[in-house]
Amino acid sequence: MSYSGERDQFAPNMALVPMVVEQTSRGERSYDIFSRLLKERIIFLTGQVEDHMANLITAQMLFLEAENPEKDIFLYINSPGGVITAGMSIYDTMQFIKPDVSTICMGQACSMGAFLLTAGAKGKRFCLPNSRVMIHQPLGGFQGQATDIEIHAKEILKVKSRMNELMAKHTGKSLEEIERDTERDRFLSADEAVEYGLVDSVFTRRD
């Protein structure tokens, strides 16, 4: 989880997107696969969390709320983490909208990805069996004059404190436990994530 907006090697390559063709009364209609899944109220959060991705995800959530404020939204997460401010815009939208947001981890949910995973509606947070979750404290990488570095250090400590409070709220852990466990990288299996309170259960297959 970074406090800077720099891209890294985890940025997704979205050049090749499968298309789905459906028959309608007016003939054939084609969608990219993600647009088709959006019709089923499924949103994908994959790759590094950054501003462009966050804008797309928040827009999709607001659109689905406008379509049906009573029906759940399903957020599938496979992310190594990313920029804190971008992630917090997704988090705040999840808490703001009326529909419950069910979160599902597939692959990995690390850093900001793990934070968003546990921010789903209580009882509706899931991991697939071989997924991995990692929690840690925010990362700082600011460079510049000493005074500016001091200002940014104070800001990142405030952000760290706020995120620990929110993580404690969503997991049911004490603030002291969260502070201790996020001091360094902590990796959890799907079952360990359930035990920790990050998610509610492990999905093995659909009913």
Curated annotation (Swiss-Prot):
The keyword Protease applies. Keywords: Cytoplasm, Hydrolase, Protease, Serine protease. GO terms for biological process: protein quality control for misfolded or incompletely synthesized proteins. GO terms for molecular function: ATP-dependent peptidase activity; ATPase binding; serine-type endopeptidase activity. It is an enzyme of class 3 (hydrolase). The active site is at 111 (nucleophile), 136. The keyword Hydrolase applies. It is found in: Cytoplasm. PANTHER family: ATP-DEPENDENT CLP PROTEASE PROTEOLYTIC SUBUNIT. NCBIfam families: clpP, PRK00277.1, PRK12553.1. Fourteen ClpP subunits assemble into 2 heptameric rings which stack back to back to give a disk-like structure with a central cavity, resembling the structure of eukaryotic proteasomes. Belongs to the peptidase S14 family. Cleaves peptides in various proteins in a process that requires ATP hydrolysis. Has a chymotrypsin-like activity. Plays a major role in the degradation of misfolded proteins. HAMAP family: ClpP. This is ATP-dependent Clp protease proteolytic subunit. It comes from Yersinia enterocolitica serotype O:8 / biotype 1B (strain NCTC 13174 / 8081). The gene is clpP.
